[in-house]
């Protein structure tokens, strides 16, 4: 399997899990346990905003899909993406319209797929800006998308378990 193929397969798995994580009531998706944490809704918003920023702004050097219109449609903050966000602010993140949010998620994932469909191994070596300097495109995707998203998938499954909900992708025989 090529490196690009590996990335595509890993992101496909993460995206399916994140899509499945949208299933639940508003109360379940916005549940925050005592002692602080994020909600499932926060995890969904954060992972999608991160992917949008990495693929579109950093790698493709174009505007992100997110704009004020998506904020209005979903009820989410127009600014920010969750990194460094205090728990109190994170717990206020609320997705008012999950269908609109799902449309944003799908648009971001489609942009990522278009990039990966034409990317080469040389593209993965190109340096792009990061919060601490630069990193390769491959590092940005593997660290901040593949690894990070699967960490949030575990967080989502923990939050679902605390509410007696099935894990994401349980119907597919995995989690």
Please annotate each region the language model reported:
Residues 1-7, 90-93:
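Short, charged, low-complexity loops and linkers
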Residues 2, 25-26, 39, 86, ...:
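Helix N-cap and loop-to-helix transition residues
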Residues 7, 11-18, 22, 105-112:
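Hydrophobic alpha-helical core bundles mediating ligand binding, dimerization, or RNAP-core interactions
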Residues 8-12, 19, 27-84, 127-175:
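Short, contiguous alpha-helical
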Residues 22, 26, 116-120, 160:
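A structural signal for long alpha-helical coiled-coils and helix-turn connectors
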Residues 77-126, 140-145:
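Acidic/histidine-rich alpha-helical segments that form the ligand environment
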